[in-house]
Amino acid sequence: MEKTIRTLIARNDESFSFLYQEVVDSFQQVRFFDPETELPDLSDIDLLYLPGGYPEKHLDALFKAEATRRAIKDYAERGGRIIAECGGMMYLCESIVTDEGEYPMCGVLPYKITARQADRKLSLGYRRFILDGKEYRGHEFHYTQFLGETPPSVTQVYNAKGEPVATPVFKYKNVLASYTHLYLVES
């Protein structure tokens, strides 16, 4: 008998708002929480899913939710499974830098993201990559960038034409993170 995967999904109106309904429906047992206002119960889950959105527009609230950020970092360090896409990946990084200042995030990934106006650059398109023998497909849409050099990827990412792109994919313990919004129904 197949084990039921208990999934906790970050969701709110903007910071973590980009969810394919088909992906949500594909998870067997789902609960939601708002990282801006709720401390998640991570004790009885098999997967934490941090989808995309616009965390850079709500940095004060995410910064003030320090207990939530700490709980997510501790969960990752204990080997908890996390899938983080775009805004979710940004949230797992060390910090997000804006024109107003630098905001510490979860600190699971040792990178900084810039959302400064001068650094804005559109990254857009369909993406695919193979990791651990599985093919992942999705799309990329963001204006934020890594501060400094783009960190190394654990696999090569390709666009719809099969051409390599510089979008990195990260694996840390049981964390999978990328700017790519994954269509997990196929994966």
Identify the function of each model-found stretch.
Residues 1-5, 113-187:
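Amide-donor transfer/coupling interface in amidating biosynthetic enzymes
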Residues 1-64, 74, 113-119, 145-150, ...:
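N-terminal beta1-alpha1 cap of cysteine-dependent amidohydrolase-like domains
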Residues 3-6, 42-44, 76-78, 84-85, ...:
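Short gly/pro-enriched beta-turn/loop segments at secondary-structure junctions
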Residues 31-33, 84-85, 178:
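General beta-strand structural signal in soluble alpha/beta enzymes
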Residues 36-38, 71-72, 92, 165-167:
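Generic recognition of flexible, low-complexity loop/linker segments
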Residues 55-128:
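Cysteine-nucleophile active-site neighborhood
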